[in-house]
Amino acid sequence: GMRNPYRFSFDRGGTNQLWAGDVGQDAIEEVDTITLGGNYGWRVYEGTQCTGNDPGLCTPANYIMPIYQYPQTGSRCSVTGGNIYRGPQNTFPSGTYVYADYCTGEIFTNAANVTALLDTPRNISSFGEDESGELFITGLGGTLDKIVRARSSADFDGDFKTDVSVFRPSTG
């Protein structure tokens, strides 16, 4: 099973795969690709970590393990499932899964090691995309922000850590 799936999305421009963020209990936040009838291991596993609730069932081959996971360290506490980026503005490479931590406002991608790509000053409650595939984030306070590629080119190693920012449209 899953513990607490929070935000689902389909890869609408590629495989049509269903993705979900699954909020952990005490240790790990995870992102899963959803398979019909799939068993994602909750109560036996939190992420790829055996919980000890039923050690006799801790056999990874019996479960679908997460695609990405990160620990609940510091203020990280709740994954917000995101979207696969397919936009024409090349904010991210096409096919990149973009998601967040609700408590910290950090935005992550499907990089091999999960490190924050961008820190925002808000609790990200959801992602959305426009008709062209560009991504937006929302917060419970009513904010709607578009994620855009920064105008300067300071990302020398291609990891997107310095050339992505949040753009807030002006009101009026």
Role assignments for model-derived ranges:
Residues 14, 103, 131-132, 140-141, ...:
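Short loop/turn segments that connect beta-strands within the blades of beta-propeller domains
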Residues 11-13, 85-87, 130-132, 157, ...:
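Structural WD40 beta-propeller signal
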Residues 125-150:
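Blade-level signature of beta-propeller repeat domains, shared across WD40, Kelch, NHL, RCC1
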Residues 150-172:
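Trp/Gly-enriched beta-strand/coil motifs that build multi-repeat beta-propeller-like domains
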Residues 1-112, 145-147:
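Beta-propeller domain segments
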Residues 20-21, 99, 136-138, 166:
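Residue position within the beta-strands of beta-propeller blades
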Residues 2-7, 79, 124, 132, ...:
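Conserved positions at the start
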Residues 113-131:
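Conserved blade-ending motifs and adjacent loop-strand segments that build the rim/top face
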